[in-house]
Amino acid sequence: MDKRFYSFFNLTEDQAIAILDTPQDQIGEDDSRYIAASHLVNFNSERSIAALMRAIHHTDPEMENRIVRRKAVETLGRLRATVALPVIRECLSDPDCYMIENAVWAIGEIGTEDPEILQEIMLLLDRSEQTYRVIIQTLAKLDYKPAIAKIKPFTTDESLPISSAAITALCRLNRDFSQMDQIVTLLQNRNVIARRLSIQDLIDANYYAAIPDISRCPVSLVFRLRGIGMLSEAGIQEGAIAFVDIQPYLEKSLIDHPSSLSLVHSYDTLPDLSFLIHELYETDFGRCYTAIKTILENYAESAPEALFNTYEQEAKNDYGAHFHVMKLFPWLRHAPAYNLLIEALHNKQPQFQKSRAAAAIALAEIGDPRAIPEIKSCLTAQIWDLKYASLLALEKFGDRSGYELLANDDDLLIREKRNS
């Protein structure tokens, strides 16, 4: 699990516990019980776990407190606090449907074989206005076969995320994965939520055969890399697949050119450049990739100036558009973007992390050798995709010296790349 963004707040364990224990109506304007509950994920101690359980038992119905209780349950799940299981179990009957969702998820993270708890979770499928997807996923994760009959009707639910989870759960519980092609098909659905969540379902099922399809799915690179990365590591460790089988799909995904994707959007007529630039700010990255492809094919000469303008006006503060702008400059062969790319390469603000790998590859595309030491410095980062992208970039420059720095890297895919 990637935990590098867990600790944003300069709080000690004692400070976080003190804030969390403060009644909501006495909390200072500079303090937040929600932040305190979030921050305690960094302290897997008896004291922190006890404080989180106390927060759950504080049942003030005010919205601020309900949100804190939900977060406390989530944090206990992340800490895999077995001692908290009885307290979390009580939340399965909470009137707050979101609290129930978090409690089910947390029990799945902690794990249990208690048939009474598992039956309680299963019976939540009979409750109206509940988040069924998480319940179904958890029952499958905990391998609760008595839930098969309850889950089956959800395979035809009108909500694609729910039906996808149900189909996947039945495949896992029955040990029969013949229906997983239905989930693979969702990777090309026009509904972006269905596309994103189908990747998670493929991960949950360890469906390694879907790696090529995931690499072509038009969603944010973050979702694709998570799917390819987790499936690849699990498959290689299991001996079911080899690195050479997944390497081309992983590397095409890191390069992230729209030509390697199966796009789900199109235009009836050619839009003007201003419309396409605006599309780079869409939260549905499928639309962004269609816009990028159209810019490259139709506006190669005029696009660089427009991209610089949008960067100065908005994109430097919008992490999605920032990412796309960084990628577009080298594909447009726009060498004056060098300084912007160097800045993006070293930008450690959390929201711009995916732009760093994009900048490394972009700098190699531009081909200015001044970038070599700048890229090489990223090999010591704790971000696997940045390290992998840096290796690809250095290879393009003909520099393979970075491999020696990563001889004993913690990440399996980095080690496999080094040895390939």
UniProtKB/Swiss-Prot annotation:
Q: Which InterPro entries match?
A: ARM-like (IPR011989), ARM-type_fold (IPR016024), PBS_lyase_HEAT (IPR004155)
Q: Which GO terms describe its cellular component?
A: phycobilisome
**Pfam families assigned:** HEAT_2 (PF13646)
The superkingdom of the source organism is Bacteria
Q: Identify the keywords attached in UniProt to this record, alphabetized.
A: Antenna complex, Phycobilisome
Q: Which GO terms describe its molecular function?
A: oxidoreductase activity
UniProt entry tagged with the keyword rRNA processing: no
Stretches that traverse the bilayer: none
**PANTHER family linked to this entry:** DEOXYHYPUSINE HYDROXYLASE, PBS LYASE HEAT-LIKE PROTEIN
What's the protein name?
A: Uncharacterized phycocyanin operon protein Y
Record the organism. Pseudanabaena tenuis (strain PCC 7409)
